[in-house]
Amino acid sequence: MKLKQNIEKEIIKINNIRIHQYTVLYTSNCTIDVYTKEGSNTYLRNELIFLERGINISVRLQKKKSTVNPFIAIRLSSDTLRRLKDALMIIYGISKVDACSCPNWSKGIIVADADDSVLDTFKSIDHNDDSRITSDLIYLISKIENNRKIIESIYISAVSFFSDKVRNTIEKDLSKRWTLAIIADEFNVSEITIRKRLESEYITFNQILMQSRMSKAALLLLDNSYQISQISNMIGFSSTSYFIRLFVKHFGITPKQFLTYFKSQ
């Protein structure tokens, strides 16, 4: 029974994750099963994974050590991503990438050929030093053989869409009671125009709003600096119980389960 409980503590399944920021993820203490609508892949411990912005995944994580965080992740802001893309285009002499002509490799998930030297380079990056993050990532990518796919994925992820502009507006103040009418006023266009432009990108305003709130909630839980009731208010929900129900519906687990799993001891 104790062995079963320990195994359950080391495993978690999280549904409906949308990657809003280009992410470099090091599986330092876990294996990850990643599920998309096309299928699934398993990524082993000590792998370096590049996740394109905009992909939707569900994951099953299994820790090696239950008291240690499962992975280390670097998430790039839109400004950092643009700077990185521009620098890589110059360094590698690439003028343009045609997203339509790119091979559909693992649906936006790329595993790097990462030896110990590459992994050590990743570990040495200071995630909080914005002044160095671009140069550090350029150096990291330069050490990876066959890095063309990574560079192309960065280029593709740096492309901005109208839905990104709507999301960025919402994320400036997630506590605000956003409506389609307010967004239309922000952009000085009609609600119908907003709706049609989002429909052309196969997404709705309500989907963007919910994705933004749930993603922010997950990041705030990972930060481990706030109570669940505080997070609920910060992302626009006055009722904590209602927030918890929505979190469970979205991710398939409770905020407490999420927090407990990712909390280092």
From Swiss-Prot:
Tagged with keyword Methyltransferase: no
Keywords, sorted A to Z: Activator, DNA-binding, Plasmid, Transcription, Transcription regulation
Disruption phenotype: Loss of autoagglutination, hemagglutination and aggregative adherence to human epithelial HEp-2 cells, loss of aggregative adherence fimbria I expression.
Domain named HTH araC/xylS-type: residues: 164-261
Pfam families, sorted: HTH_18
Keyword Aminoacyl-tRNA synthetase: no
GO molecular function, one term: sequence-specific DNA binding
DNA-binding region: 181-202, 228-251
Note in the entry: Encoded on an unnamed 60MDa plasmid.
Oligomeric form and interacting partners: Homodimer.
Function in brief: Transcriptional activator of aggregative adherence fimbria I expression in enteroaggregative E.coli.
Protein name: Transcriptional activator AggR
Organism: Escherichia coli
